[in-house]
């Protein structure tokens, strides 16, 4: 799901065996409607364009894909934000378009010929019995890592994964940060520190 320069939205999906695809979500009460039906774009690609008023930041959505003999709900392959329902554990894509975009402070990356790398896992970085966040890592762990002389961090389990106990090795979406650790803006702030 991409926001265009004019404020409109476009979403594309490659589904060569689909006969129809719909965008379903909070904005249409999770129903298949013609206003949210994708159009074939050739070579198995499908596309839907929407005016800016049709989607809002934070709304949950999925695709409903129909194919010969059936159909079902799917997460878009290239979505960049997923959230998991605390009760059902079901994932939904989430429209991510905050009113206030993150403003980068550091525009250059320091390159070292021999980096000293600290491997870490955001969720396991707290002394408390809980899943830690990007903000907590930035505030509590990063200063200690720097004090120890490390100049590079390698973060494990950044991509969304359904089972936390897998330590992120069972990736379910390659393009979305794990929502357990915080928002994309909080991750940007960590990277910018």
Give the positions of each predicted feature.
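Aromatic-lined carbohydrate-binding/catalytic grooves of carbohydrate-active enzymes
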Residues: 132, 144-189
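Short amphipathic alpha-helices and their capping/turn segments at secondary-structure boundaries
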Residues: 105-108, 138-149
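Residues that line or immediately flank small-molecule/substrate-binding pockets and catalytic motifs
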Residues: 25, 124, 157
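Short proline/glycine-enriched turn/loop motifs at strand-loop junctions of beta-rich domains
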Residues: 14-21
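Predominantly extracellular/luminal cell-surface or secreted proteins
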Residues: 24-26, 66
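Short beta-strand elements bearing conserved aromatic residues within extracellular beta-rich modules
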Residues: 21-23, 61
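The feature marks proteins involved in alpha-glucan
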Residues: 1-10, 31, 37-119, 124-129, ...
């Amino acid at each position: 799901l991409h926001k265009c320069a004019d404020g409109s939205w476009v979403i594309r999906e490659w589904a060569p065996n689909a006969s129809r695809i719909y965008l379903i979500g909070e904005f249409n009460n999770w129903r298949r409607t013609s206003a949210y039906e994708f159009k074939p774009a050739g070579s198995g690609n499908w596309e839907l364009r929407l005016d800016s008023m049709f989607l809002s930041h934070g709304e949950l959505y999925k695709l409903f894909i129909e194919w010969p003999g059936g159909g079902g709900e799917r997460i878009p392959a290239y979505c960049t934000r997923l959230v998991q329902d605390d009760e059902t554990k079901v994932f939904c894509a989430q429209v991510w378009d905050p009113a206030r975009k993150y403003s980068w402070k550091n525009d250059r990356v320091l390159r070292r010929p021999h980096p000293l790398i600290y491997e870490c896992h955001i969720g396991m970085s707290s002394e408390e019995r809980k899943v830690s966040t990007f903000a907590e890592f930035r505030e509590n762990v990063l200063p200690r890592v720097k004090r120890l002389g490390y100049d590079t961090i390698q973060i494990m389990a950044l991509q969304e994964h359904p089972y936390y106990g897998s330590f992120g090795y069972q990736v379910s979406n390659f393009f979305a940060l794990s929502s357990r650790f915080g928002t994309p803006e909080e991750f940007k702030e960590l990277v910018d520190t």
